């Protein structure tokens, strides 16, 4: 009986300690979620206008198609007074998109371009939103930061891994503020989970799981083709960029997410929205050390990329991430973060903590609700970026998180396409098989 009392007292003491630790964290702040070292910090930064806490931020937009216009141009313009910003200039290779952006922004024709380099020459532009086709993310981001501009880059950060590290190194060297356009990074529930993990509320992490599943009977990304797109209305060769030479193709222009030349499909478009948050929730995002991915396309065959995919990523701490994506079945996995002592369940603006049965005497079940922002809050995504530009700190989708997530995405694509499980060394940045054979990352044609 005495031994049972001692165990009960120990469990009660541990429960009290955990709650006290959580309270201290809540009062003092969580600090950076990144604990691992970063590279490229010792080089001189680029110059740019110093933006004070009350200064207006002038924003340029590169890529103003559907995502660029509706998510970024429209939202930033509609909230310009609230955020003290001005939608200043826009760039796109398609004249129809340029004209639409110009009219909505209310700017003169001299403020819209078909070459982003002209926009970057302007000294009055402080920040650039990049919502181009994926293979243009890296060159525009790098040139923007070299020109002293802060950047918001739509997910995925880059098309391929090597250029991802080019963006990463440039951001570290120039000290520009970067935000990834994976909007669910802004959801407070993931940051609450990170706090609970750091406070040892669920023990050592075991597995984080999520999914992004749709069912598109006509085929995902088969967007309407605008008949106004012609050889004369689009800078086709410029749009192709480093992907190689091929004849004008409207299907490729509007439905580019289906093709490996330009995109990795579900991985970059949908699962990026789940990989970033699950890495935040871990409390200390790491580079993966092993990634495996499967994929099939037995239902929608009009594409290169899979319509059904599953990703597993291991991390040095022992944490495993599992994400599933589909465009042919909408039933997803429950979102949860499993620890040795307890599990976190996610839903809407809520996180539920439930102890594992063997640890029920040590951990109380708890529910945390009303965690805002919640959902796809693009206004919050922009506000976070602008706030860090003015006041310093880290965005919720910062460069450290984004680079780690990009490694997962890029290795998952390689794994699926090569039918390999791949290992990653964060210090050397080398990719190998389980037998030690080095594997070169996918890249553009020579």
For each feature predicted by the language model, list its residue ranges.
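Short basic (Lys/Arg) and small-residue
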Residues: 155
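Mobile, glycine-enriched helix-loop/loop "lid" segments at the mouths of ligand-binding/catalytic clefts
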Residues: 226-245, 352-362
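Rossmann-like dinucleotide-binding domain that binds NAD(P)(H)
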Residues: 230, 237-319
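Tryptophan-centric aromatic hotspots in well-structured domains and transmembrane helices
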Residues: 98, 134-136, 152, 165, ...
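C-terminal helical cap and adjacent loop that interface with cofactors, partners, or active-site loops
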Residues: 4, 11, 19-32, 44-45, ...
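N-terminal glycine-/serine-/threonine-rich beta1-alpha1-beta2 phosphate-ribose binding loop
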Residues: 2-150, 162-177
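A contiguous active-site-proximal alpha/beta segment in oxidoreductase catalytic domains
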Residues: 45, 150, 158-233, 238
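Glycine-rich beta-alpha junction loops
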Residues: 94, 211-217, 243, 295-298, ...
């Amino acid at each position: 009986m005495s031994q049972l009392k001692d165990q009960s007292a120990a469990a009660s003491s541990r429960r009290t300690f955990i709650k006290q630790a959580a309270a201290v964290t809540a009062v003092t702040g969580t600090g950076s979620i990144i604990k691992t070292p970063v590279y490229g910090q010792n080089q001189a930064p680029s110059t740019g206008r110093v933006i004070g806490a009350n200064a207006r931020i002038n924003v340029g937009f590169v890529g103003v198609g559907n995502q660029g216009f509706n998510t970024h141009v429209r939202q930033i313009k509609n909230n310009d007074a609230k955020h003290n910003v001005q939608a200043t200039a826009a760039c796109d290779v398609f004249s129809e998109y340029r004209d639409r952006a110009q009219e909505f922004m209310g700017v003169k024709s001299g403020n819209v371009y078909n070459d982003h380099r002209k926009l970057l020459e302007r000294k009055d532009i402080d920040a650039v939103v990049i919502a181009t086709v994926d293979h243009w993310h890296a060159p525009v981001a790098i040139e923007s930061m070299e020109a002293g501009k802060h950047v918001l880059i739509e997910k995925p950060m880059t098309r391929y891994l090597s250029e991802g590290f080019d963006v990463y190194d440039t951001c570290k060297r120039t000290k520009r503020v970067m935000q990834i356009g994976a909007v669910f990074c802004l959801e407070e529930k993931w940051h609450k989970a990170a706090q609970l993990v750091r406070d040892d509320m669920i023990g050592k992490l075991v597995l984080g799981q999520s999914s992004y599943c749709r069912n598109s009977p006509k085929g995902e990304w088969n967007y309407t083709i605008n008949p106004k797109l012609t050889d004369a209305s689009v800078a086709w060769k410029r749009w192709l960029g480093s992907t190689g030479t091929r004849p004008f193709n409207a299907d490729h222009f509007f439905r580019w997410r289906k093709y490996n030349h330009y995109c990795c499909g579900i991985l970059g478009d949908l699962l990026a929205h789940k990989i970033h948050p699950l890495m935040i929730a871990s409390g200390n995002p790491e580079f993966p050390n092993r990634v495996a991915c499967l994929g099939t396309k037995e239902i929608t065959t009009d594409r290169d990329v899979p319509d059904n995919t599953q990703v597993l990523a291991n991390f040095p701490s022992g944490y495993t991430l599992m994400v599933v994506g589909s465009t042919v079945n909408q039933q997803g996995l429950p979102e949860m973060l499993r620890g040795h002592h307890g599990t976190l369940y996610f839903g809407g603006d809520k996180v539920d903590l439930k102890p594992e049965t063997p640890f029920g005497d040590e951990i109380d079940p708890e529910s945390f609700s009303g965690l805002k922002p919640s959902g796809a809050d693009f206004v919050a995504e922009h506000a976070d970026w602008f706030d860090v530009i003015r006041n310093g700190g880290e965005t919720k989708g910062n460069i450290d998180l984004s680079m780690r997530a990009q490694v997962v995405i890029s290795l998952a694509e390689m794994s699926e396409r090569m039918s390999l499980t791949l290992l990653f060394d964060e210090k050397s940045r080398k990719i190998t098989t389980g037998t030690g054979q080095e594997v070169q990352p996918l890249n553009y044609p020579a």
